């Protein structure tokens, strides 16, 4: 890793070794999240905790150096999510400040007073970011939230004031829309990485109590969890976050799972967008009717269906319309069959009538259902007896 060796005599050698280490460790190893496969809710969160815990702890002074890798804009300036000041690394480090753009410092986006400023949380780069000193000071240890009537607005549009989000009326700090998802995923990381201790943080300050419950799941008060879910949805993972996640993996040897897998937010907490699974790759074969006993062989391929929707008409194949993703069909001519059954009996039909059937595979459920409708849809017709 980039900091496994602490002392180098020759500066040129230090630069070479750090660069080489970063190149080797920027991406997670194959199978990094295997232990989380197939889990959801609290079990998934605990599996992720076991994957990302025991990170390499850095010193507080080293954060200044780390920011030069984790939070550098394309123009070489500090990537400050609280201002548009254009800080230069090292040269503009705080120090004292009186006004916005005086200097940048080390912002605990998850306020350090909430966990009593103790290690390893106080130097965990996944919630520490370089920000304008003045704006950081105005934010103080207030929770994130939405503000309709700000008492303070920063140069880039961050706001401080009474919370306008339902469920809380205290003072909050609202970052700009471009970074709300970044901060939400930072908080999901903190709730997961420190699930072994976070249950005791709610009593450390009034502000912490407004956001945290006294448990390790679901961790957050309902209003705040809903807020984070909305921010996560409306500001999806950006290339900035992906690059930062890779850079921090090279430094800390752990990752933010909710950047690598945004769907984990829904799978753990049930907020944010439901993951959209890929549609089944193939249709089932041998689809046929025997006295309105429908039979088929299940679809195969890398992505298997969760089930099938069979649509029926007594007019023609053309009268059967393709289903729409996200819609459930429960009418008298629609039949849902789970994957693996490979048959359906349909009874109480009119005698001496020809019925037409089409079969659509799907993945997911509810509003997240995704039907396969392209290509040649399996169809069959069958006439009932007298």
List each language-model region with its residue ranges.
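Bacterial N-terminal signal peptides that target proteins for export
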Residues: 2-13
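Recognizes extended acidic, P/S/T-rich segments that occur
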Residues: 309-351, 364-375
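Domain-level detector of nuclease and nuclease-like folds
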Residues: 96-105, 110-274
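N-terminal signal peptide c-region/cleavage motif recognized by signal peptidases
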Residues: 18-23
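Pro/Thr/Ser/Gly-rich low-complexity, intrinsically disordered linker/stalk tracts
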Residues: 272-307, 351, 366-386
């Amino acid at each position: 890793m980039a900091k496994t060796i602490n002392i180098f005599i020759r500066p040129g050698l230090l630069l070479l070794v750090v660069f080489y280490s970063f190149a080797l460790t920027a991406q997670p190893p194959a199978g990094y999240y295997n232990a989380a496969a197939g889990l959801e809710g609290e079990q998934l969160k605990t599996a992720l905790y076991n994957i990302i815990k025991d990170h390499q702890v850095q010193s507080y002074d080293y954060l200044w150096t780390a920011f030069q890798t984790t939070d550098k804009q394309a123009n070489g300036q500090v990537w400050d999510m609280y201002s548009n000041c254009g800080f230069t690394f090292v040269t503009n480090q705080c120090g004292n400040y009186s006004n916005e753009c005086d200097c940048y410092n080390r912002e605990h986006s998850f306020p350090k007073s909430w966990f009593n400023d103790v290690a390893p949380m106080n130097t965990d780069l996944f919630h520490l970011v370089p920000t304008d000193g003045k704006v950081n000071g105005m934010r103080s240890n207030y929770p994130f939230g939405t503000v309709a009537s700000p008492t303070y607005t920063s140069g880039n549009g961050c706001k401080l004031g009474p919370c306008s989000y339902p469920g809380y009326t205290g003072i909050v700090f609202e970052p700009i829309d471009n970074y709300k998802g970044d901060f939400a995923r930072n908080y999901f990381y903190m709730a997961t990485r420190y699930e072994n201790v976070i249950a005791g943080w709610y009593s450390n300050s009034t502000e912490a109590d407004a956001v945290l419950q006294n448990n390790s799941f679901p961790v957050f008060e309902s209003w705040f969890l809903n807020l984070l879910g909305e921010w996560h949805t409306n500001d999806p993972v950006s290339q900035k976050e992906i690059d930062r996640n890779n850079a921090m993996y090279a430094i800390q040897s752990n990752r933010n799972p909710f950047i690598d897998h945004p769907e984990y937010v829904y799978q753990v907490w049930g907020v944010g967008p439901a993951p959209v699974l890929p549609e089944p790759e193939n249709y089932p074969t041998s689809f046929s009717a025997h006295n309105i006993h429908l039979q088929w062989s299940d679809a195969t391929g890398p992505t298997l269906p969760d089930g099938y929707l069979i649509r029926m008409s007594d007019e023609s194949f053309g009268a059967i319309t393709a289903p729409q993703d996200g819609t459930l069909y429960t009418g008298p001519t629609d039949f849902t069959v789970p994957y693996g059954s490979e048959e359906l009996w349909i009874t109480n039909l009119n005698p001496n009538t020809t019925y037409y059937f089409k079969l659509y595979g799907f993945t997911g459920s509810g509003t997240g259902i995704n039907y396969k409708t392209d290509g040649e849809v399996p169809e069959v017709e069958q006439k009932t007896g007298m």
